[in-house]
Design a protein with these regions (language model features):
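Acidic/histidine-rich catalytic cores of soluble enzymes
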Residues: 64, 161-258, 262-265, 270
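Conserved beta-strand edge residues that scaffold enzyme active sites
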Residues: 77-78, 100-101, 143-144, 180-182
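Generic structural signal for helix capping and beta-alpha/helix-loop junctions
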Residues: 80, 104, 146, 183-184, ...
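N-terminal pre-domain/capping segments
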Residues: 2-131, 135, 150, 161, ...
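Substrate-binding cleft of secreted/luminal carbohydrate-active enzymes
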Residues: 275-276
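Surface-exposed cleft-lining segments at the edges of enzyme active sites
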Residues: 142-152, 181-190
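Mobile beta-alpha loop/short-helix "lid" or hinge segments that flank ligand
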Residues: 132-144
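Short, hinge-like loop/turn segments at secondary-structure boundaries
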Residues: 88-91, 111-115, 155-156, 193-195, ...
């Protein structure tokens, strides 16, 4: 999934189309040496990126015209009837959603009452996503500042696991995103870190209904994204994209910065990834 700064109506169409067509990751002519990725990636973006358009239908239409194949919403909180009407009118599907409360109401919170609210939010996100035809709910599991890693690891897995039966019933996987939340990596560490902890964390759920929505730009500061992709392998069920510059120490537009996109494409071909990005 492409991420970017806010776009006005005047700028949305040309910039979004350019991003969709010429990104070093999704560009049709820059797939991989053997061409494996060509035709296997579906471009999507978050609804919050589409600043132009007053109605949901207008936003969907703009995204489709810009060349995107799908769109992600924020759940819970959507009007299911309105979303389905926008899908029908534009032909643009909802490929998934982002659990809208996961930063504030966390599965790592030491308060059981807060974790119960986080669980209900996740369950409702799964229901609403299913109701509009989406196939994933992106989830940030919490924050490392909520306690020692061993404790938040255990409590988050226990809490999220309670939603797995519903995810399986609806056919909507829970997609854990790697973010700067001081969990499963060393936030003050160097750029030689691996995805070992993320692999272990996902595997402890022991369920095909929990995987990774891997953000390629988020952890370039901390390790080789190609190698992380190789480690995570089939645990990756969806991708998010952004650029990052180690030299400048900040996020960048896709194609800028120093992220090794060539190795990323090679790694994705090696694991035979196909799906949303």
């Amino acid at each position: 999934m492409l991420t970017s700064d806010s776009l006005s109506r005047r700028h949305f169409m040309p910039l979004a189309a350019a991003a969709a067509a010429s990104s070093p990751f999704v560009a049709q002519g820059a797939a991989s040496q053997d061409g494996y990725l060509k035709g296997r990636l579906y471009k999507t973006l978050k609804i919050g990126m589409v600043k132009a358009g007053k109605s949901l239908e207008e936003k969907f239409a703009l995204a489709k015209e810009a060349g995107f194949d799908g769109i992600e919403l924020n759940t819970p909180g959507i009007n299911v009837e309105e979303v389905n009407a926008a899908i029908k009118a534009t032909g643009l599907p909802v490929d998934g959603s982002v659990n809208s409360s996961h930063w504030q109401v966390r599965h790592t919170d030491p308060d059981p009452a807060v974790r119960a609210k986080a669980l209900e939010s996740l369950k409702e996100a799964l229901r609403q996503t299913h109701a509009v035809g989406g196939n994933t709910v992106l989830l940030v599991v919490g924050k490392g500042s909520d306690g020692p890693e061993e404790e938040i690891w255990k409590r988050s897995i226990e809490n999220i696991s309670k939603a797995i039966p519903l995810a399986a019933e609806l056919g909507v996987p829970i997609a854990v995103e790697n973010v700067w939340n001081q969990f499963c990596y060393d936030h003050e560490g160097d750029h030689n870190q691996t995805a070992d902890k993320f692999v272990k964390y996902i595997d402890e759920f022991n369920s095909p209904w929990v995987g990774m929505q891997f953000d390629i730009g988020n952890h370039w500061k901390y390790g080789s994204m190609g190698d992380w992709i190789r480690q995570l392998n089939k645990r990756i069920i969806k991708l998010d994209l952004k650029g990052f510059s180690r030299e400048m120490g900040k996020f960048t537009k896709i194609g800028e910065g120093d992220l090794d996109w060539a190795d990323v494409r090679k790694a994705l071909a090696e694991i035979k990834y196909a799906g949303w990005a």
